[in-house]
Regions:
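Left-handed beta-helix
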Residues: 1-180
Length: 180
């Protein structure tokens, strides 16, 4: 066999590896097996594992694991939701939401990822990224985009995308919180 290699440290690699969970090829089957996810799908092409979804929601070709979605107005086509509790999710072109608590998630294009969103509502553009970072001073909402591929220099040391702090400062705040 071949070596299975994955890199979750880069935005593009993270997205590609998570989206492999939906793929119907050998890599998709291997990735699902590594995470002990089923091959079987429901009548709408979804893989649902300990998922609570409302009647009437338009969910097709999705993977939903350990998540609750409450709003019947939800639209997920080819999206991934792992962990969390959500009101309405709108992912007409896919996207990934992980470990969040959000009233409304709106993804305006493919490839958006929301990690641990703790917000009443969140809207991401195509390739958008969001993370709620927990610090001693409270949660920080950080944004970036898959189009940004180089986080050296000013891209790391200066706030980007309207963020309240730089990624460098966010890392220091997380370290401070972890060591407290």
């Amino acid at each position: 066999g071949e070596v299975f290699w994955t890199d979750f440290g880069q935005h593009l690699a993270l997205r590609q590896n998570l989206e492999a969970l939906l793929a119907e090829d050998e890599r998709g089957r291997l990735t699902r097996a590594l995470f002990n996810l089923p091959e079987a799908k429901d009548e709408n092409g979804n893989r649902l594992v300990r998922a609570s979804i409302p009647a009437g929601a338009d969910i097709r070709g999705a993977l939903i694991v350990d998540a609750e979605i409450r709003a019947p107005e939800t639209l997920i086509h080819g999206g991934i939701v792992i962990g969390g509790s959500y009101g309405r999710i709108r992912m007409p072109q896919g996207g990934i939401a992980m470990f969040g608590t959000a009233g409304e998630l709106d993804f305006d294009g493919p490839h958006a990822i929301a990690f641990q969103p703790v917000l009443p509502s969140l809207r991401l553009p195509e390739g958008g990224r969001h993370a709620t970072v927990l610090t001693q001073d409270g949660p920080l909402q950080l944004f970036t985009n898959e189009a940004i591929t180089d986080y050296r220099g000013d891209a790391y040391a200066q706030p980007l995308e309207g963020n309240p702090v730089s990624f460098d400062e966010a890392a220091r705040l997380v370290d401070k919180t972890a060591s407290a």
